[in-house]
Curated annotation (Swiss-Prot):
Enzyme Commission designation: 2.7.11.1
Name the record gives this protein: Putative serine/threonine-protein kinase YrzF
Binding, ATP: 33-41, 54
Annotated family: Belongs to the protein kinase superfamily. Ser/Thr protein kinase family.
Catalytic activity: L-seryl-[protein] + ATP = O-phospho-L-seryl-[protein] + ADP + H(+); L-threonyl-[protein] + ATP = O-phospho-L-threonyl-[protein] + ADP + H(+)
Organism name: Bacillus subtilis (strain 168)
Example GO molecular function: ATP binding
Pfam family, one: APH
UniProtKB keywords: ATP-binding, Kinase, Nucleotide-binding, Serine/threonine-protein kinase, Transferase
Top EC class for this record: transferase
Cross-referenced PROSITE patterns: PROTEIN_KINASE_ATP (PS00107)
């Protein structure tokens, strides 16, 4: 007999050739709250408790199993969501109410030294669990209503190559964001352009050229 989470996960049917709106069918009990490269996340309420159901695309079922195992290793850390149930294609987890760092920048919610330090502690917990924190970006860091920072989307925490993404974000925070003249509210359009240029290594190449020019 299927658990409720399994049954609800099975109601989610994705369109195969759609990039932005992949949900073809789903239970009315599920509300779409997040979109990612390998899965969509839905909110559901059971017994008065709100939870998040992450349902992976069929081609990413192996990622579901991998991410569930990583969350199990992180179970002792307060910086990651509690996991209630896992399956071949889904993870049922704690619903974290708050704003992503991405939305903080869009809305002008201040990012503080304490928030940066909490991310550092979260990644330190992951390393202590034998993991290699990777693919840390503004959308998987959440500031809760109590001021706590939580980290989600940990599927790449077992990759072996070095990922400098968090170090680059931290450097930008100290070198740019903390400057009094730097805007604390940035339109999403510009955030997307910055992310695109970063992925294309534009900033890395540009600053490397400047360094060579003035060295």
């Amino acid at each position: 007999m299927l658990t409720k989470a399994e049954a609800l996960a099975h109601t989610v049917i994705y369109r195969k050739n759609s990039r932005f709106d992949k949900v073809k069918e789903k239970s009315e009990e599920l509300t779409l709250i997040g979109k990612g490269r390998s899965a969509y996340v839905f909110a559901l309420t059971e017994g008065g408790r709100k939870m998040a159901l992450k349902v992976f695309f069929p081609e990413y079922q192996a990622t579901a199993v991998k991410e569930a195992a990583i969350y199990e290793k992180l179970a002792g850390s307060a910086f990651y969501p509690d996991i209630y149930e896992t399956g071949d294609s889904f993870i049922l987890m704690e619903y974290i109410k708050g704003e992503t760092f991405y939305n903080c920048l869009k809305k002008g919610i201040a990012i503080s030294d304490d928030m940066i330090q909490q991310v550092e502690e979260a990644l330190s917990d992951a390393r202590a669990a034998g993991l290699n924190p990777s693919d840390i970006h503004l959308r998987n860091l959440i500031l809760t209503e109590t001021g706590a920072v939580r980290v989600i989307d940990v599927a790449r925490f077992e990759q072996t190559k070095t990922c400098t993404q968090w170090d680059d974000l931290k450097s930008a925070y100290h070198a740019l964001y903390k400057k009094p003249i730097f805007p604390k509210k940035i339109p999403g359009f510009w955030l997307e352009i910055i992310a695109f240029l970063y992925k294309k290594d534009w900033f890395q190449k540009h600053f490397a050229q400047r360094k060579r020019k003035y060295s």
